[in-house]
Amino acid sequence: LHVRSRRQRQMCIRDRITGKGTLQPKMDTWKVWFKRPQPHLEALKELYTKASTDVPVIERQMAVGENHLRPHLIHFNRCKNVLLDGFKIRESPFWTIHLYMCDGGLVRNLDVKAHGHNNDGIDFEMSRNFLVEDCSFDQGDDAVVIKAGRNQDAWRLNTPCKNIVIRNCQILKGHTLLGIGSEISGGIRNIYMHDCTAPNSVMRLFFVKTNHRRGGFIENVYMKNVQAGMAQRVLEIDTEVLYQWKDLVPTYEERITRIDGIYMDKVTCESADAIYELKGDAKLPVKNVTIKNVKVGEVKKFVKKVNNVENVVEKNVTYEREVK
């Protein structure tokens, strides 16, 4: 489902999907495409190269051959006053809900379950002024993700993702409760998640990720009042997350991401490999990370590691036992 304005400089207004039904795509084709054969990797390389060398968007025609570039299930492009309310989703080819360059909206009472490759729950990309509440996510990837475009295209669009609140949501399964990045080239600010739960197992509760190709900024991101079961990391910042791109394509231009103002407060977790791991970039260290009132039952590997971060404030961070 793709909703967008016909004119690039105009927005669709008051677009909505509501009701008690279920959106369930037929997955026969898409499940085959979850694999990454060589033609798919070559298509990714071609698309990345075109974007990095300023090939006009209209000339980036990729739906050919065996490229296997999967679509989002729900994609809103340049829409205003969006409402998503009350329905269920079962499975998705790629990101489940993608809100791209949208302004204003409410996402509530959704029951989302999708366990395929790249099945994020909801991705905000260069969007602003949204509330997400009372949703359940059961994902094959991250639950709630904040993005701001990749590299040259996002630098050109210069549209930060900002002013987003997520509350009273739960993630039943998935990689991350709140993910920031790694596509953050347009900048991210003013994100607040509170009163959410991850009762089972996740890789990370709060994950800030970027790399030396992204540029942009991340500032004023908050997590508060979260309860969790098991996690590899309660909080992680990693400034060199490249995944398959590391070897697939070269660095066309280096721009380090500015990260300033990451806050975690009142978080409990039954078991974690580590409480926090902060890996900044020596060329532009992360600044101002506050971690307070965090309680972990069992720590399995290490309590904390910090590199290239200025002004880490830790207060009342405790654990019951360390098991190695």
Predicted regions and their residues:
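Glycine-rich beta-solenoid repeat tracts in large extracellular/virion proteins
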Residues: 6-10, 72-78, 95-101, 119-126, ...
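Short, surface-exposed polybasic-and-hydrophobic patches located at secondary-structure transitions
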Residues: 36-38, 282-286, 308-316
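Beta-rich carbohydrate-recognition and catalytic domains
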Residues: 16, 27-28
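Carbohydrate-interacting regions of secretory-pathway proteins
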Residues: 63-66, 114, 134, 195, ...
